[in-house]
């Protein structure tokens, strides 16, 4: 049952309290609601100051770093090889995690708690009265496992102390292995199956219980539980084989030839510094992979050199093609074992799309809509080529696109140079402050910087932001680890460390004796909810003594994107943790985050925060507008490329039996046929599909981001484009999309927010309609 542990960056949960609870209760809503305007204004100003002003941050954080017995290493992070008594609490207020050794104790206590819940579930096999609450018990079991696995996953990515990273790794491995045993438990599956076969009990279930129970049941089936002994053995063998083949594919994922050899004359136009790095004597050795190869395509004047490089860049190694084809055949075998015609059918059954045919309808509609714009963008480059070559019959080839695009952008940038850099208006503090102001206006929630206890965070650069509702008080806790440091993952990400769920009355008495039950909670309308705790990590430059960390526009978009996930975690409050916040369909989960990116470019929202870090003067919007125009020169060409990649993903994970001859699968023919369909350039030999690494990680789901971006664009245009800071629009987004997490059919969510009932049932017509929606 994979729902026993979903990815950490996709969790959330809330909890009610009562006098019988030993949980840590959050501050009363009265502490945050009804504040004097001056206090609220002071809290707002503090957001910018704690990120941008080193002196303010030092004073503000001193309480949490000034423990006498606590030592610091030369890199500035806390040395955790000390006594537990040195700390007021552990990581994320988990008292187990004051030292690395506490991870093992936390894991052991969690497994003991899980064991008690499993015994309750197994008791339902012989005691029918226990079936009624089996689904909520399954959900509690899932929550216990996730709190260890997801916390460990985050610590592995962000903690600077190797001892803690190692402890987290060991905890993750131990709990993941334990979870996999449960995922394939016939006894646990039988309990859940009995629930749904008892019509009297089914009629008593809440909507959420039915949704979660169905998800868990399907996950059990996808894990092969319903197969006979031989089938289960085959299932385990195939999944192991697929994992190994995937690793082989990724490791061999490179062009057939590592470089091409050119003369100095043939490589003319290369950046001088790059040319010097690649030269040996009179020869230039241009790599066929990575950034140097891309830069060479943009710079080399000789078309034959570009053609040679481009063709070699798109010629995959024999090993890569072989690994990919073995991977695809094994996935087909797994799908057939599970009664599906293709791997895409197997994977998409619980997604918005439903099946691969619906995905292709969406992609075809989007491609037809995108193609004219893409051709128009390339026609501009073809005219530049004709002028440059003096040949009116010149045709733009695939290897010409990067070169002439760079020529065009160079001309445009020369005409639009400005003395002020955009980043000077985007300090980390102003951007986070702006996000808080935007959320306050559209959702009635905001950020309040909060001092941390000793031991609560993993590095002194980490800021804690409490997420506060104007009506409910504290509804979530966010830890912002935004600045780069050695050993930290460079990839921006949102992690849900502790998610939201209701704590039921029968749990409260047990919590007083449970060592893992100390969690911050929220009392709301007579219910107790666990407060969600999330962490954001980014890789922004470290603030300087003389100026704050300044962001590029792309980094601003990144922060808005990740905050979209964060707010989904905070507002997606459900009774069951399996469907809270970002725990929804994978082809729906990016909608809130992509939607948030729109606020990073809108003049009205920018006016709330985009100010010069030194003079405090507002951003001249024309400056950003020019930058945005430059970035959009080839937006349809880029979208066309992404659509074709998503189509390739579907084709290769479709019913490929017809392409298997004498036990051998020929992927090249499928790739060639797709390339011939509505092309942008004249045909040329290529086996690039063997270098498309996402075919492993995103198998049959590469379309998801395109679908979510399309839906986000539609929502923005219909609700927010005319009045982006509208509380009415924000309330609709919150009430129809965010608050449901994964407990509502995503098609009903999108139909509700767009007020388009035709979309509510989903299916082929809904997918096609979304693909053809006018977003301009």
Curated annotation (Swiss-Prot):
Binds 1 zinc ion. One of its GO terms (molecular function) is metalloendopeptidase activity. Its cofactor is Zn(2+). The lineage of its organism: Eukaryota, Fungi, Dikarya, Ascomycota, Saccharomycotina. Cleaves proteins, imported into the mitochondrion, to their mature size. While most mitochondrial precursor proteins are processed to the mature form in one step by mitochondrial processing peptidase (MPP), the sequential cleavage by MIP of an octapeptide after initial processing by MPP is a required step for a subgroup of nuclear-encoded precursor proteins destined for the matrix or the inner membrane. Its main location: mitochondrion. It comes from the Eukaryota. The active site is at residue 562. This is Mitochondrial intermediate peptidase. Residues 1-28 form a transit peptide. Zn(2+) binds at residues 561, 565, 568. InterPro entries: M3A_MIP (IPR033851), MetalloPept_cat_dom_sf (IPR024079), Neurolysin/TOP_dom2 (IPR024077), Pept_M3A_M3B (IPR045090), Pept_M3A_M3B_dom (IPR001567). GO terms for cellular component: mitochondrial matrix; mitochondrion. Its EC number is 3.4.24.59. GO terms for biological process: peptide metabolic process; protein processing involved in protein targeting to mitochondrion. It is found in: Mitochondrion matrix. Keywords: Hydrolase, Metal-binding, Metalloprotease, Mitochondrion, Protease, Transit peptide, Zinc. It catalyses: Release of an N-terminal octapeptide as second stage of processing of some proteins imported into the mitochondrion. It holds the Pfam family Peptidase_M3. Belongs to the peptidase M3 family.
